[in-house]
Amino acid sequence: MAIRDWPEDARPREKLLKQGAAALTDAELVAVFLRTGVAGKSAVDLGRDLIERFGGLGALCRADRVAACRAPGVGEAKYALLQAVMEMARRTLAEDMQAGDALSSPAAVRDYLRLILRDKEYEVFCCVFLNAQNRVIAVEELFRGTLTQTSVYPREIVKRALAHNAAAMILAHNHPSGVNEPSQADRSLTRRLAEALALVDIRVLDHFIIAGASALSFAEAGHL
């Protein structure tokens, strides 16, 4: 049965408008995004199939172009729309992070870093530069590496921090392996960076390791 023939309260779009997006199941959310189904399947059925195909809603949203466009009911236009939605989410989180104090709203910083780093297939080292009020000046990806490591040069980080006239920084890198435990090299690097930046009166407030959906804080774990 086509969705248009369902009772009004059961139709995903009408349900969203009346009860809010949080009231929808994952399959119903995907159905609203898709708008239409395929032969023999409603948009909700198709949404359910796509979630199962990719292993979850998050995995569907993060699927690459080739994999997404091979899936029934998606195609280039839907993939482009999905990428636009994801980029809107990233920019919204960036605005939230930049609007607040990084110390009083650490969740916004953590969520943003998790969003930009979690799906990288190689190690990336990022720096969040903060002013004297702990507000975000800039976020920069400074180094890229391989699946298991990246080379980080303290001198370059100090140069960028001085260029931004930063008073403090938050460091972040990802572990594509999915293991968020800091290695001895991670701890040693954090210590060296904190010492190098302290020489120019710049504080390192935290260092996050992003591993899949998890984010480990050096400050919270007592490593900083």
Curated annotation (Swiss-Prot):
Decide whether keyword Ion transport is in the record: no
Q: Which family does it belong to?
A: Belongs to the UPF0758 family.
- Name a single GO biological process: proteolysis
* Protein's recorded name: UPF0758 protein Tbd_2588
> Which residues of the sequence carry a binding annotation for Zn(2+)?
173, 175, 186
Query: Ranges for the MPN domain?
Result: 102-224
Q: List the PROSITE patterns.
A: MPN, UPF0758
Source organism of the structure: Thiobacillus denitrificans (strain ATCC 25259 / T1)
Recorded hits in CDD domains, A to Z, give: MPN_DUF2466 (cd08071)
Residue numbers covered by motif JAMM motif: 173-186
* Keywords from the named record: Hydrolase, Metal-binding, Metalloprotease, Protease, Zinc
Zinc: is it a keyword of this entry? yes
Per its UniProt record, what InterPro entries does this chain match? MPN, RadC_JAB, RuvA_2-like, UPF0758, UPF0758_CS, UPF0758_N
A Gene Ontology molecular function term of the record: metallopeptidase activity
